[in-house]
């Protein structure tokens, strides 16, 4: 059994940012061995375990194969023979496909560190195209304060355009889309999320009426209300928007309608 720290926490550490949490991959182990060592199984689709003390997530190394539509249309394979590099290859971006061993050595088979230094967002493999959620996640990464100036690699732009040309985005659940939107709204550069959707025609079917982007607002619900306002309050009718967001948007809409009506009377 070998344990490696992986993913976004490595990226953030290399940028001098303390990660909020850490993810771990276990190579050469089995579910039975993990549970025998006190780990608690929590994964439904693939083996993920909680550390008995830190409660951090530890996943067995795995590969995945497209077997259906949408981000859930994958079959996962895991056994002790799967290597760390095989596990890293399934990750979305090169800057998220790095690992660190217990001696602090960085394992970087896809040159994520170089892309990090050059401020480039680049997909790890052609498998990026198989999961439409990766396009939405990439848009969200552009809202991060330490990533918002990163450029999207030309070849990755081509991937986004290909995803936009299919109907794969429609296979995503409304709940999953809103989760990404909500995460983006909680970031300082949330307008970048919507800019990417517009730039790469990723607006259908969830943001069909999205034409303009605004960065006004501090709290997520006010940001959402402002996005709605500049798009004539016609945006994302099929998303499970929380009531507090809806109420804030409705108050602003009624206020603007009242002002407009009063102006006409004058």
Where are these regions (language model features)?
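Catalytic cores of the polymerase beta-like nucleotidyltransferase superfamily
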Residues: 1-266
């Amino acid at each position: 059994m070998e344990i490696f720290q992986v993913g976004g926490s490595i990226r953030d550490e290399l940028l001098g940012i303390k990660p909020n949490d850490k993810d771990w991959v276990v190579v050469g182990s089995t579910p039975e061995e993990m549970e025998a060592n006190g780990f608690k199984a929590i994964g439904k689709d693939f083996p993920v375990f909680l550390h008995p003390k830190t409660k951090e997530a530890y996943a067995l190394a795995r590969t995945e194969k497209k077997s259906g539509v949408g981000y859930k249309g994958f079959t996962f394979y895991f056994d002790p023979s799967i290597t760390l590099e095989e596990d890293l290859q399934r990750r979305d971006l090169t800057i998220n496909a790095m690992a660190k061993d217990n001696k602090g050595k960085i394992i970087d088979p896809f040159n994520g560190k170089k892309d990090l230094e050059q401020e480039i967002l680049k997909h790890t493999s052609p498998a990026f195209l198989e999961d439409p959620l990766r396009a939405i996640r990439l848009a969200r990464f552009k809202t991060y304060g330490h990533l918002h100036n990163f450029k999207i690699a030309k070849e990755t732009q081509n991937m986004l355009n290909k995803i936009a040309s299919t109907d794969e985005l429609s296979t995503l659940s409304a709940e999953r889309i809103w989760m990404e939107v909500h995460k983006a709204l909680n970031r300082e550069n949330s307008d970048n999320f919507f800019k990417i959707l517009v730039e790469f025609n990723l607006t259908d079917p969830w943001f069909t009426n999205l034409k303009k982007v605004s960065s006004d607002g501090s709290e997520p619900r006010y940001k959402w209300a402002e996005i709605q306002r500049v798009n004539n309050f016609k945006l994302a009718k099929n998303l499970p928007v929380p009531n507090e967001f809806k109420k804030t948007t409705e108050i602003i809409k009624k206020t603007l309608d009242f002002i407009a009506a009063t102006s006409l009377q004058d």
